[in-house]
Design a protein with these regions (language model features):
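Active-site proximal loop and beta-alpha junction motif in alpha/beta enzyme cores
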Residues: 1-70, 76-146
Length: 146
């Protein structure tokens, strides 16, 4: 099987700057083990895998060691691949992910991402955090991703 892999530097207009992410468009997701192996081979913070679903895309992200529920820079990189390479001229794309639908729109100023808001709540301070900081934090908060 041959499929392109794009490496995109997100959050920059300069080459070799920003945050790199790999983007791999596919016709269908391969097994989790294969996706994980591809991400490990890329050895970037995240590799995004996208599959068309109607006019939208399914989107998953893997680090070199695990799948993650949400990744901003790899979503932005995926949108750039869709709008600049796969469907030139397209100005909005919706990705369906483990975190729900994510919309990215291209404007004259750049890309705008609409991401879910996750409520945070105070949690007990982990002893190892206080030890590492050398002080007791005023407050520690977590959300659904912690």
């Amino acid at each position: 099987m041959r499929t392109p892999i794009f490496q995109v530097d997100a959050f920059t207009t300069r080459r070799f700057a920003g945050i790199p992410a790999a983007v791999m468009p596919m016709n269908g997701f391969l097994t989790d083990a294969v996706l994980q192996a591809v991400a490990a081979e890329n050895n970037l913070a995240e590799t995004a895998f996208l599959v068309p679903q109607g006019s939208d895309y399914l989107l998953r992200w893997f680090t070199p060691t695990t799948e993650v529920p949400l990744c901003g820079h790899a979503t932005l990189a995926s949108a750039a691949v869709v709008m600049e390479r796969l469907e030139p001229g397209r100005s909005t794309v919706v990705f369906h992910s483990a975190s729900g639908p994510l919309t990215v729109t291209r404007t004259t100023l750049g890309y705008v991402m609409d991401f879910p808001a996750r409520a945070s709540a105070a949690v007990p301070t982990p002893p190892e955090l206080a030890a590492a900081l050398g002080a007791e934090p005023i407050e520690v908060v977590a959300n659904a991703f912690n």
